[in-house]
């Protein structure tokens, strides 16, 4: 059983009991979160439900387990023949959510 949800302009495939790192949102650790924008899902019986654009009445419930930052991404700008370069880094914030139930 799985579902594809939309969060932060991205789509994520989630399963029950799985921990997924999503875009940061302001909730404390241990708080419940619901996702109503389920785009597609498969039931335990194997039936696939596709939304237009979302599956009606479907929701994914999870619990926030961690707030943090991803690994650093290094950006390097190099100007050829000028002996000049610029280096910059970025660390994106995330919220880790453990999926507790999927209802389609």
Curated annotation (Swiss-Prot):
RNA-binding listed as a keyword: yes
GO annotation terms (biological process): translation
Pfam families the UniProt entry points to: Ribosomal_L21p (PF00829)
SUPFAM superfamilies in the record: L21p-like (SSF141091)
Signal sequence range: none
Single annotated GO MF: rRNA binding
Gene Ontology terms: cellular component: cytoplasm; ribonucleoprotein complex; ribosome
TM segment ranges: none
UniProt KW keywords: Ribonucleoprotein, Ribosomal protein, RNA-binding, rRNA-binding
Subunit annotation: Part of the 50S ribosomal subunit. Contacts protein L20.
Family note: Belongs to the bacterial ribosomal protein bL21 family.
Known role: This protein binds to 23S rRNA in the presence of protein L20.
NCBIfam families: L21
HAMAP family registered for this protein in UniProt: Ribosomal_bL21
Name this polypeptide is given: Large ribosomal subunit protein bL21
Organism for this UniProt entry: Francisella tularensis subsp. holarctica (strain LVS)
Lineage of the species this protein comes from: Bacteria, Pseudomonadati, Pseudomonadota, Gammaproteobacteria, Thiotrichales
């Amino acid at each position: 059983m799985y579902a594809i949800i939309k969060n932060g302009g991205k789509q994520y495939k989630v399963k029950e009991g799985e921990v997924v790192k999503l875009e940061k949102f302001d909730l404390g650790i241990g708080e419940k979160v619901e996702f109503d924008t389920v785009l597609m899902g498969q039931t335990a019986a194997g039936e696939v439900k596709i939304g237009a654009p979302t599956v009606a009445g479907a929701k994914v419930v999870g619990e926030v387990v961690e707030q943090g930052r991803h690994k650093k991404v290094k950006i390097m700008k190099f100007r050829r023949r000028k002996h000049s370069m610029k280096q910059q880094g970025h660390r994106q914030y995330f919220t880790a959510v453990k999926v507790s139930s999927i209802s389609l």
